[in-house]
Amino acid sequence: MNFIFNSSMLLAITMLTFPLIYNLAFPDKTNNFPLYCKTTVKMAFFTSLPALLLFINTGQESTITNWQWFSIESLNMTMSFKLDYFSIIFIPIALYVTWSILEFSLWYMHSDPYIHRFFKYLITFLLTMIILVSANNLFQLFIGWEGVGIMSFMLIGWWFGRTDANTAALQAVLYNRIGDIGFMLAMAWLMINNSSWDLQHIFMTNMDTLALMGLVIAATGKSAQFGLHPWLPSAMEGPTPVSALLHSSTMVVAGIFLLIRFHPMIKDNPTILTTTLCLGAITTLFTAICAITQNDIKKIVAFSTSSQLGLMMVTIGLNQPYLAFLHICTHAFFKAMLFLCSGSIIHNLNDEQDIRKMGGLLNIMPITSSALITGSLALMGTPFLAGFYSKDSIIEAMNTSHTNTWALIITLIATALTAIYSLRIIYFALLNQPRFLPMSPINENHPNLTNPIIRLAMGSIFAGFILTMNIPPTSMVPLTMPPISKLSALIVTITGLLIAMELNSATNKSLMMSYIHTHNFSNMLGYFTYLFHRMYPLANLYLGQHIATMLIDLNWYEKTGPKGQANLHSTISSYISSTQKGLIKTYFLSFIISIPMIMLII
């Protein structure tokens, strides 16, 4: 059993390197390379299933140490894979979602001349995330961490001819650099105090609050929590398959996954738990508020991702890492599907992303519309869809905790807002009369478009049930909860849905004569980007100009250099000339008076 378990999972991971090796060996053979990549990921998914089934049946876990990288006096570094609860469940889900995204990319990117390079980047992106998830030491985890960072930069800036895409890619790197500083601080602290980066050794150490705060900063940067969040909506400048992969099962969940991995160190530290709780609550509310007034369909879905990441951070603050992980797994299905549906709509409407210029797509694109509605309902937490099993459990866990009343209230408000912006997409894009140009070449009959969306729709419907019924500890349902606590999430969701229906029908035809401050605050992302991307750089520019002109022109040339020397000598000479008046008679008189006085003294 152990042989089958280890070999199937390692083979699935190794298979992802086959397309990369093939491309290195035969760089000119690119005709069928995208299809080869898609087939490889599909086969890797089926190869990883025996390990998942063995884990479900027997609860088997293992740590595989293959070979020693290097050894110094204070550190022994090995290449080691940790196949435990989190990696065994996450890897098949990531492979399944990526398989669907790669198949969708065959349709979406078919006209791109560098599609083979695009698929190579996507495979590398997935591989680095799997390295991060399965790493058993911090060095290996850091390789995966930096790998997803650099691949996100390459993929967000895929259309490098556009200034916005380049700026968005740079934003992603720069904000993640701040998080990386926190990660490296934690690694340095562990090197000094523990002399080992292996997870099993780290978990026996009492980590300092400062080192754990470094991990929280790392997660804040990578998972776009409040303060380091502006890169996430900007990342929508990349192609839609990139957005789907970035937001579902790679990059953005890496920060949350890091905190889940280090939960044995966090669980007994109230400072860190409170920090993550408050940070997550602020993030989930702020990004939900921003999503309400956006008009770009991809940005609405992006802000919904950020809001769900805030919910996962809240769950870690509640000391519930398994619930946070369950939400990562269920969220991957419907979030990837929402992005693929958005990509289908955008591509069919000649790259139109404004929901105000859509409408009436329910009859024209039935498969995409059905999947979009299913994904939106799952995102809201509608009973018995994927999102319900994790989202409902998170809010129930908050109800049973007594330290976080305000976080509970904020999260419930954000849950209601989720229903509002989800329904807003449905209302504007799918219902009413068409508002797009009549010549749009709408066609959703291609199997590379419909098959991935249908597969992910199946996952969005059944994944939550399958996961919670088969995998502990979520399979053990608490039966002693008051009905009002159990129903609170559902009541809030239904309330938000009703308010959303009323708001959308009331505001659809009304004209806003003048923008109000609350609308501007939401639409302009809380003025965050204006403050940090405009005012600070402008202030730095003025300061730099002032320093340059003061230092070089005024100080050097006028105070110290040629003009300064001339001024210095003219000042000294004028002082001397003013003290020496040339009054010879007066000088002689004083000389004559002083001589008798000196003689008398002597």
Swiss-Prot record:
Places the protein is found: Mitochondrion inner membrane
Record flagged with keyword Isomerase: no
Catalysed reaction, written as an equation: a ubiquinone + NADH + 5 H(+)(in) = a ubiquinol + NAD(+) + 4 H(+)(out)
Keywords: Electron transport, Membrane, Mitochondrion, Mitochondrion inner membrane, NAD, Respiratory chain, Translocase, Transmembrane, Transmembrane helix, Transport, Ubiquinone
Membrane topology reported for the UniProt record: Multi-pass membrane protein
PANTHER family associated with the record: NADH-UBIQUINONE OXIDOREDUCTASE CHAIN 5
Name assigned to this protein: NADH-ubiquinone oxidoreductase chain 5
Organism: Osphranter robustus
Organism taxonomic ancestry: Eukaryota, Metazoa, Chordata, Craniata, Vertebrata
